[in-house]
Amino acid sequence: MTKDSLFSRPQKPVPPFEFNASVVEVFDDMLNRSVPCYRELIHRQAQLAAHFYQPKTRIYDLGCSTGNLDLAICSAMDAARPFELVGVDNSEPMLKVCRERMRETPPEANISFACSDIRNLEMSNASVIILNLTLQFIPPADRQNILNRIFQALVPGGILLLTEKTVHAHAGLSELQQDFYYRFKAENGYSQMEISQKREALENVLIPETMESHRKRLDQAGFKAVDTWLKWFNFASFIALKEKS
């Protein structure tokens, strides 16, 4: 695993963050050092995917990046249990790594990949859809339509697993959460310059919202059974169930 040092040198101006080949090379280290509870998140989501998967349906991983969750899902599925998994990302460098990692997958796994903007992706017959740290990079005006289409693509009894970086409606609590997040990154070896430059690079690229905004949007899409199953300061992971009629 290559260490993330993308922002270890002064950059003027700091370019906007993008998922290019340089980021892909260090992405796994970046995730482990920048996303609180990342390993637990992936481990439990894979178990949830295996639990809710219905025969002859699909699992979609929207924003699959380098395939960490997809590998975990393959491990979590019962032996000799056929399943279909579709990994989607709009970064071809990410998908290149993901495809390589998924070459030695179980024979019962039908795995495919699509290099696509999820706003244009056609989805259907899904029992599990995962949207990890992806919606936050989509313009807010487009987010409701994506969730509407996810709800329509799910079969009854299917689930959406949504993880996002969030902000708090209360300014003081939002600042507290940010401070503890930067403390977390510093404890994982990032310098103050790296933290500052990464924050600048993400400005207007990653646009977080409140948990209330996410819940309202999920409700409008049709999800009436929603829970926050994992939360760490300004990171939250939701499970949204499309109930059987």
UniProtKB/Swiss-Prot annotation:
S-adenosyl-L-methionine binds at residues 38, 63-65, 89-90, 117-118, 132, 199. It comes from the Bacteria. The keyword Transferase applies. One of its GO terms (biological process) is tRNA wobble uridine modification. Keywords: S-adenosyl-L-methionine, Transferase. Gene3D superfamilies: Vaccinia Virus protein VP39. InterPro entries: CmoA (IPR005271), Methyltransf_25 (IPR041698), SAM-dependent_MTases_sf (IPR029063). It catalyses: prephenate + S-adenosyl-L-methionine = carboxy-S-adenosyl-L-methionine + 3-phenylpyruvate + H2O. One of its GO terms (molecular function) is carboxyl- or carbamoyltransferase activity. It is an enzyme of class 2 (transferase). Its EC number is 2.1.3.-. Catalyzes the conversion of S-adenosyl-L-methionine (SAM) to carboxy-S-adenosyl-L-methionine (Cx-SAM). HAMAP family: Cx_SAM_synthase. Belongs to the class I-like SAM-binding methyltransferase superfamily. Cx-SAM synthase family. Homodimer. This is Carboxy-S-adenosyl-L-methionine synthase.
